[in-house]
From Swiss-Prot:
Belongs to the asfivirus MGF 110 family. Residues 139-145 are cytoplasmic. The lineage of its organism: Viruses, Varidnaviria, Bamfordvirae, Nucleocytoviricota, Pokkesviricetes. Keywords: Early protein, Glycoprotein, Host membrane, Membrane, Repeat, Signal, Transmembrane, Transmembrane helix. This is Protein MGF 110-1L.
Amino acid sequence: MLGLQIFTLLSIPTLLYTYELEPLERTSTLPEKELGYWCTYANHCRFCWDCQDGICRNKAFKNHSPILENDYIANCSVYRSNNFCIYYITSIKPHKMYRTECPQYMSHEWHEAVIRKWQKLLTYGFYLVGCVLVANYVRKRSLQTIMYLMVLLVIFFLLSQLMLYRELEDKKHKIGSIPPERELEHWCTHGKYCNFCWDCQNGICKNKVFKNHPPIGENDFIRYDCWTTHLLNKCNYEKIYKHFDTHIMECSQPTHFKWYDNLMKKQDM
């Protein structure tokens, strides 16, 4: 009984943490408080941008690079059920659908710290429950039974470490798919979901370019291998996942990329 009580107490904060968001009917007009969530994944959707005189600024991330309005910014609608979120790109037909799991990302700013905290608390809690159970058996069982329990506890320890703290497998990028470091800011402004824009460790991914960008959990939002191509006046990147999807933009966008301006000046000389 004591072990069950301890487990129940440990489960309460976990249930509170994973409390599901309220359902949201499909819409292209979002509550302002949810922009931070949706614009983390669907950054190219029009509801994330405030465009005036051809210059677009990100509504959710104020220090995000401004861009010129072009076909990168797509019309989108979003939908949320009890256990997952979906956003649709409606600018093209058939509409493209992308799915993310909502309960993991209720608040990005404290997500990483909280998830690690509760992982540790749950692990220690399981160990405590195991020790209490072993202590009860010590008084009632034989030495052989106790040894079996100790072996099971060790196996449980190893499995819990594997499940809670497993390291991500190193992803192999395709040859030529990773742009030079000096160009990451350009590519990750437009191809934000490309995996070369993210540093993922222990299931938590941080943006390499925008340091104040909220960390996100690794999911199929960033599973794309991307190819990048530089032309004289155009740039394009291709998402390579279930099928090829090419996006084209002008390389001079955003205009503050001085390295590109300098490069073009040298070519003109």
